[in-house]
Protein backbone atom coordinates (compact mmCIF):
# COMPACT_ATOMS: atom_id res chain seq x y z
CA UNK A 1 0.00 0.00 0.00
CA UNK A 2 3.05 2.26 -0.32
CA UNK A 3 3.41 5.10 -2.88
CA UNK A 4 4.80 4.10 -6.26
CA UNK A 5 6.40 6.49 -8.75
CA UNK A 6 5.08 4.64 -11.80
CA UNK A 7 1.48 4.67 -10.59
CA UNK A 8 1.98 8.27 -9.52
CA UNK A 9 3.01 9.19 -13.07
CA UNK A 10 -0.02 7.37 -14.47
CA UNK A 11 -2.30 9.49 -12.28
CA UNK A 12 -0.56 12.87 -12.14
CA UNK A 13 1.12 12.61 -15.54
CA UNK A 14 -2.02 11.26 -17.18
CA UNK A 15 -4.10 14.18 -15.96
CA UNK A 16 -1.37 16.57 -17.10
CA UNK A 17 -1.39 14.93 -20.55
CA UNK A 18 -5.14 15.57 -20.83
CA UNK A 19 -4.50 19.17 -19.77
CA UNK A 20 -1.87 19.68 -22.48
CA UNK A 21 -3.87 18.00 -25.26
CA UNK A 22 -7.12 19.84 -24.52
CA UNK A 23 -5.21 23.10 -24.14
CA UNK A 24 -3.51 22.72 -27.50
CA UNK A 25 -6.76 21.80 -29.22
CA UNK A 26 -8.64 24.69 -27.63
CA UNK A 27 -6.02 27.21 -28.76
CA UNK A 28 -5.93 25.69 -32.25
CA UNK A 29 -9.70 25.83 -32.68
CA UNK A 30 -9.74 29.42 -31.41
CA UNK A 31 -7.05 30.61 -33.82
CA UNK A 32 -8.72 28.79 -36.72
CA UNK A 33 -12.12 30.20 -35.70
CA UNK A 34 -13.70 26.78 -35.54
CA UNK A 35 -16.24 27.92 -32.99
CA UNK A 36 -18.24 24.73 -32.46
CA UNK A 37 -15.07 22.71 -31.97
CA UNK A 38 -13.66 25.45 -29.73
CA UNK A 39 -16.70 25.39 -27.41
CA UNK A 40 -16.68 21.59 -27.18
CA UNK A 41 -12.94 21.52 -26.50
CA UNK A 42 -13.22 24.25 -23.88
CA UNK A 43 -16.04 22.35 -22.17
CA UNK A 44 -14.03 19.10 -22.09
CA UNK A 45 -10.97 20.97 -20.83
CA UNK A 46 -12.94 22.61 -18.04
CA UNK A 47 -14.55 19.31 -17.07
CA UNK A 48 -11.10 17.75 -16.67
CA UNK A 49 -9.20 20.71 -15.22
CA UNK A 50 -11.87 21.59 -12.67
CA UNK A 51 -10.55 18.63 -10.67
CA UNK A 52 -7.15 20.31 -10.18
CA UNK A 53 -8.09 22.55 -7.25
CA UNK A 54 -8.93 20.60 -4.13
CA UNK A 55 -8.65 17.19 -5.83
CA UNK A 56 -5.33 16.76 -7.67
CA UNK A 57 -3.64 19.31 -5.41
CA UNK A 58 -5.38 17.75 -2.41
CA UNK A 59 -3.99 14.28 -3.02
CA UNK A 60 -0.53 15.59 -3.86
CA UNK A 61 -0.73 17.63 -0.67
CA UNK A 62 -0.98 14.40 1.29
CA UNK A 63 2.42 13.52 -0.20
CA UNK A 64 1.31 10.00 -1.09
CA UNK A 65 1.06 10.02 -4.89
CA UNK A 66 4.78 9.50 -5.58
CA UNK A 67 7.37 7.63 -3.56
CA UNK A 68 9.85 10.34 -4.54
CA UNK A 69 8.93 13.35 -2.43
CA UNK A 70 10.41 15.83 -4.90
CA UNK A 71 7.92 14.64 -7.54
CA UNK A 72 5.03 15.13 -5.12
CA UNK A 73 6.26 18.65 -4.44
CA UNK A 74 6.78 19.49 -8.13
CA UNK A 75 3.35 18.31 -9.27
CA UNK A 76 1.68 19.88 -6.22
CA UNK A 77 3.06 23.28 -7.12
CA UNK A 78 2.13 22.94 -10.78
CA UNK A 79 -1.45 21.87 -10.12
CA UNK A 80 -1.81 24.51 -7.39
CA UNK A 81 -0.61 27.53 -9.34
CA UNK A 82 -2.59 26.63 -12.46
CA UNK A 83 -5.81 26.22 -10.44
CA UNK A 84 -5.59 29.18 -8.04
CA UNK A 85 -5.04 26.74 -5.17
CA UNK A 86 -3.21 27.96 -2.08
CA UNK A 87 -1.81 24.68 -0.82
CA UNK A 88 -0.40 26.32 2.31
CA UNK A 89 -3.81 27.52 3.48
CA UNK A 90 -5.43 24.30 2.36
CA UNK A 91 -2.92 22.14 4.25
CA UNK A 92 -3.89 23.83 7.52
CA UNK A 93 -7.60 23.49 6.84
CA UNK A 94 -7.47 19.95 5.54
CA UNK A 95 -5.38 18.66 8.42
CA UNK A 96 -8.24 19.70 10.71
CA UNK A 97 -10.80 18.19 8.34
CA UNK A 98 -9.12 14.80 8.63
CA UNK A 99 -8.58 14.95 12.38
CA UNK A 100 -12.01 16.35 13.30
CA UNK A 101 -14.19 15.33 10.36
CA UNK A 102 -17.57 17.09 10.51
CA UNK A 103 -17.03 18.20 14.12
CA UNK A 104 -17.89 21.89 13.81
CA UNK A 105 -15.51 23.05 16.52
CA UNK A 106 -12.49 21.63 14.70
CA UNK A 107 -13.58 21.23 11.06
CA UNK A 108 -15.16 24.07 9.14
CA UNK A 109 -13.85 22.95 5.77
CA UNK A 110 -17.03 20.87 5.40
CA UNK A 111 -20.03 22.11 7.37
CA UNK A 112 -23.33 20.24 7.32
CA UNK A 113 -25.93 20.44 6.03
CA UNK A 114 -24.52 20.79 2.52
CA UNK A 115 -27.01 22.45 0.23
CA UNK A 116 -28.24 20.61 -2.86
CA UNK A 117 -28.69 23.38 -5.42
CA UNK A 118 -30.21 21.34 -8.23
CA UNK A 119 -33.42 23.37 -8.10
CA UNK A 120 -31.64 26.65 -8.83
CA UNK A 121 -31.42 27.34 -12.57
CA UNK A 122 -28.63 29.93 -12.22
CA UNK A 123 -26.43 27.46 -10.34
CA UNK A 124 -27.08 24.74 -12.92
CA UNK A 125 -26.16 27.21 -15.66
CA UNK A 126 -22.92 28.03 -13.86
CA UNK A 127 -21.71 24.45 -13.42
CA UNK A 128 -22.20 23.78 -17.13
CA UNK A 129 -20.60 27.06 -18.24
CA UNK A 130 -18.58 29.47 -16.06
CA UNK A 131 -18.89 29.17 -12.29
CA UNK A 132 -19.21 32.72 -10.99
CA UNK A 133 -20.30 32.34 -7.38
CA UNK A 134 -19.33 28.72 -6.79
CA UNK A 135 -21.08 26.33 -4.45
CA UNK A 136 -20.54 23.06 -2.60
CA UNK A 137 -17.33 21.44 -4.02
CA UNK A 138 -17.25 23.83 -7.02
CA UNK A 139 -14.92 26.78 -7.60
CA UNK A 140 -16.44 30.22 -8.18
CA UNK A 141 -14.29 32.69 -10.08
CA UNK A 142 -15.30 35.65 -7.88
CA UNK A 143 -14.71 34.14 -4.41
CA UNK A 144 -11.52 32.30 -5.41
CA UNK A 145 -9.88 35.26 -7.15
CA UNK A 146 -11.04 37.67 -4.45
CA UNK A 147 -9.68 35.42 -1.71
CA UNK A 148 -6.36 35.00 -3.52
CA UNK A 149 -5.92 38.75 -4.03
CA UNK A 150 -6.87 39.48 -0.42
CA UNK A 151 -4.29 37.00 0.86
CA UNK A 152 -1.65 38.25 -1.59
CA UNK A 153 -1.98 41.80 -0.28
CA UNK A 154 -1.85 40.80 3.38
CA UNK A 155 -5.51 40.23 4.12
CA UNK A 156 -7.16 37.06 5.36
CA UNK A 157 -8.96 35.95 2.23
CA UNK A 158 -11.59 33.27 2.05
CA UNK A 159 -9.71 31.35 -0.63
CA UNK A 160 -10.17 28.04 1.22
CA UNK A 161 -13.74 28.01 2.49
CA UNK A 162 -14.75 31.12 4.41
CA UNK A 163 -13.18 34.23 5.87
CA UNK A 164 -14.19 33.08 9.36
CA UNK A 165 -12.35 29.77 8.92
CA UNK A 166 -9.29 31.51 7.48
CA UNK A 167 -9.21 33.85 10.48
CA UNK A 168 -9.45 30.91 12.88
CA UNK A 169 -6.62 29.06 11.12
CA UNK A 170 -4.30 32.06 11.00
CA UNK A 171 -5.05 32.99 14.62
CA UNK A 172 -3.85 29.59 15.80
CA UNK A 173 -1.04 29.15 13.26
CA UNK A 174 0.30 32.62 12.56
CA UNK A 175 3.70 31.31 11.41
CA UNK A 176 2.05 29.58 8.44
CA UNK A 177 0.62 32.87 7.18
CA UNK A 178 3.77 34.21 5.41
CA UNK A 179 3.94 31.02 3.31
CA UNK A 180 0.32 31.43 2.23
CA UNK A 181 0.85 35.12 1.39
CA UNK A 182 3.93 34.33 -0.70
CA UNK A 183 2.10 31.62 -2.62
CA UNK A 184 -0.93 33.86 -3.24
CA UNK A 185 1.44 36.43 -4.72
CA UNK A 186 3.00 33.81 -6.99
CA UNK A 187 -0.48 32.77 -8.17
CA UNK A 188 -1.34 36.41 -8.86
CA UNK A 189 1.94 36.98 -10.70
CA UNK A 190 1.54 33.86 -12.83
CA UNK A 191 -1.98 34.63 -14.00
CA UNK A 192 -1.12 38.30 -14.55
CA UNK A 193 1.69 37.14 -16.85
CA UNK A 194 -0.76 34.89 -18.71
CA UNK A 195 -3.05 37.87 -19.28
CA UNK A 196 -0.19 40.12 -20.41
CA UNK A 197 1.11 37.43 -22.76
CA UNK A 198 -2.36 37.06 -24.26
CA UNK A 199 -2.59 40.82 -24.84
CA UNK A 200 0.91 40.98 -26.33
CA UNK A 201 0.57 37.94 -28.59
CA UNK A 202 -3.04 38.38 -29.59
CA UNK A 203 -3.86 34.88 -28.32
CA UNK A 204 -7.10 35.99 -26.69
CA UNK A 205 -8.01 32.41 -25.72
CA UNK A 206 -4.86 31.92 -23.63
CA UNK A 207 -6.44 33.03 -20.31
CA UNK A 208 -9.36 30.67 -20.99
CA UNK A 209 -6.83 27.84 -21.35
CA UNK A 210 -4.46 28.67 -18.47
CA UNK A 211 -6.38 30.83 -15.99
CA UNK A 212 -10.14 30.28 -16.07
CA UNK A 213 -10.31 26.57 -16.88
CA UNK A 214 -10.69 25.89 -13.14
CA UNK A 215 -14.04 27.70 -13.18
CA UNK A 216 -15.34 26.21 -16.42
CA UNK A 217 -17.71 23.23 -16.65
CA UNK A 218 -17.64 22.22 -12.98
CA UNK A 219 -20.61 19.90 -13.52
CA UNK A 220 -18.83 16.55 -13.13
CA UNK A 221 -16.83 17.70 -10.12
CA UNK A 222 -20.10 18.79 -8.51
CA UNK A 223 -21.98 15.57 -9.21
CA UNK A 224 -19.23 13.19 -8.05
CA UNK A 225 -17.92 15.35 -5.20
CA UNK A 226 -21.07 16.38 -3.35
CA UNK A 227 -22.06 12.85 -2.20
CA UNK A 228 -18.91 12.38 -0.10
CA UNK A 229 -20.42 13.93 3.07
CA UNK A 230 -23.78 15.35 2.07
CA UNK A 231 -26.68 14.38 4.34
CA UNK A 232 -24.60 12.24 6.69
CA UNK A 233 -24.00 12.58 10.41
CA UNK A 234 -21.94 15.25 12.09
CA UNK A 235 -20.13 15.04 15.43
CA UNK A 236 -19.53 11.28 15.27
CA UNK A 237 -16.22 9.46 15.63
CA UNK A 238 -17.13 6.69 13.16
CA UNK A 239 -16.05 7.62 9.62
CA UNK A 240 -18.55 5.09 8.26
CA UNK A 241 -21.38 7.34 9.41
CA UNK A 242 -20.00 10.68 8.20
CA UNK A 243 -18.28 9.73 4.93
CA UNK A 244 -19.71 8.05 1.85
CA UNK A 245 -17.92 6.01 -0.84
CA UNK A 246 -19.48 5.53 -4.26
CA UNK A 247 -18.70 3.57 -7.40
CA UNK A 248 -17.91 5.53 -10.56
CA UNK A 249 -17.10 4.84 -14.18
CA UNK A 250 -13.33 4.58 -14.89
CA UNK A 251 -13.03 8.03 -16.51
CA UNK A 252 -14.76 9.87 -13.67
CA UNK A 253 -12.80 7.88 -11.10
CA UNK A 254 -9.52 8.84 -12.79
CA UNK A 255 -10.39 12.54 -13.01
CA UNK A 256 -11.52 12.46 -9.38
CA UNK A 257 -8.20 10.89 -8.36
CA UNK A 258 -10.07 7.90 -6.87
CA UNK A 259 -11.57 10.11 -4.17
CA UNK A 260 -14.89 8.36 -4.77
CA UNK A 261 -13.38 5.85 -2.31
CA UNK A 262 -13.75 8.64 0.19
CA UNK A 263 -14.52 6.61 3.28
CA UNK A 264 -11.36 4.60 2.69
CA UNK A 265 -9.43 7.85 2.17
CA UNK A 266 -10.55 9.14 5.57
CA UNK A 267 -9.79 5.82 7.24
CA UNK A 268 -6.39 5.46 5.54
CA UNK A 269 -5.38 9.03 4.63
CA UNK A 270 -1.74 8.02 4.46
CA UNK A 271 -2.41 5.56 1.64
CA UNK A 272 -2.05 6.43 -2.07
CA UNK A 273 -5.27 7.23 -3.91
CA UNK A 274 -4.67 4.46 -6.47
CA UNK A 275 -4.70 1.87 -3.67
CA UNK A 276 -7.99 2.91 -2.08
CA UNK A 277 -10.07 0.30 -3.89
CA UNK A 278 -7.68 -2.39 -2.65
CA UNK A 279 -8.03 -1.02 0.86
CA UNK A 280 -11.81 -1.15 0.50
CA UNK A 281 -11.67 -4.80 -0.53
CA UNK A 282 -9.42 -5.58 2.42
CA UNK A 283 -11.88 -4.15 4.96
CA UNK A 284 -15.15 -4.66 3.07
CA UNK A 285 -16.51 -6.87 5.84
CA UNK A 286 -16.47 -3.88 8.20
CA UNK A 287 -17.85 -1.34 5.73
CA UNK A 288 -21.39 -0.16 5.03
CA UNK A 289 -23.06 -1.19 1.80
CA UNK A 290 -21.25 0.46 -1.09
CA UNK A 291 -23.38 3.08 -2.84
CA UNK A 292 -23.55 3.55 -6.59
CA UNK A 293 -23.41 7.06 -8.05
CA UNK A 294 -27.14 7.11 -8.73
CA UNK A 295 -27.92 5.37 -5.45
CA UNK A 296 -26.01 8.02 -3.53
CA UNK A 297 -27.86 10.85 -5.25
CA UNK A 298 -31.20 9.15 -4.62
CA UNK A 299 -30.27 8.82 -0.96
CA UNK A 300 -29.23 12.48 -0.78
CA UNK A 301 -32.46 13.73 -2.34
CA UNK A 302 -34.48 11.62 0.10
CA UNK A 303 -32.45 13.09 2.97
CA UNK A 304 -33.15 16.58 1.64
CA UNK A 305 -36.88 15.86 1.74
CA UNK A 306 -36.57 14.72 5.35
CA UNK A 307 -34.57 17.84 6.23
CA UNK A 308 -37.32 20.06 4.85
CA UNK A 309 -39.57 18.53 7.52
CA UNK A 310 -36.87 18.34 10.18
CA UNK A 311 -33.84 20.65 9.62
CA UNK A 312 -31.84 18.65 12.18
CA UNK A 313 -32.29 15.32 10.41
CA UNK A 314 -29.11 13.43 9.47
CA UNK A 315 -28.96 10.03 7.81
CA UNK A 316 -27.60 7.33 10.11
CA UNK A 317 -25.76 4.91 7.82
CA UNK A 318 -26.28 1.27 8.86
CA UNK A 319 -22.89 -0.28 9.57
CA UNK A 320 -21.71 -3.74 10.64
CA UNK A 321 -20.05 -4.02 14.02
CA UNK A 322 -16.27 -4.09 13.77
CA UNK A 323 -15.09 -7.67 13.55
CA UNK A 324 -11.31 -7.40 13.46
CA UNK A 325 -8.72 -5.65 15.59
CA UNK A 326 -6.32 -3.45 13.65
CA UNK A 327 -2.75 -4.67 14.13
CA UNK A 328 0.19 -2.39 14.79
CA UNK A 329 1.25 -2.11 11.15
CA UNK A 330 -2.22 -1.11 9.96
CA UNK A 331 -2.69 1.19 12.94
CA UNK A 332 0.15 3.36 11.65
CA UNK A 333 -1.65 3.64 8.32
CA UNK A 334 -4.96 4.61 9.91
CA UNK A 335 -3.33 7.26 12.09
CA UNK A 336 -1.34 8.90 9.28
CA UNK A 337 -2.56 11.76 7.09
CA UNK A 338 0.61 11.65 5.02
CA UNK A 339 2.62 14.85 4.64
CA UNK A 340 -0.50 17.00 4.67
CA UNK A 341 -0.17 18.89 7.94
CA UNK A 342 2.41 21.69 8.16
CA UNK A 343 5.20 20.87 10.59
CA UNK A 344 3.68 22.92 13.41
CA UNK A 345 0.38 21.01 13.13
CA UNK A 346 1.91 17.52 13.32
Language model features with spans:
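Juxtamembrane/interfacial segments around transmembrane helices
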Residues: 66-73, 92-96, 123-133, 233-244, ...
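Histidine-centered catalytic micro-motifs
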Residues: 55-62, 90-102, 224-231, 255-271
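Transmembrane alpha-helical segments that form the membrane-embedded catalytic/substrate-channel core
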Residues: 46-57, 86-90, 209-237
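Cytosolic juxtamembrane regulatory segments of multi-pass membrane proteins
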Residues: 78, 164-170, 242-258
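Aspartate-rich (DDxxD/NDxxD/DxxxD) Mg2+/diphosphate-binding motifs
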Residues: 55-74, 102-113
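Active-site-flanking alpha-helical
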Residues: 22, 61, 65-66, 236, ...
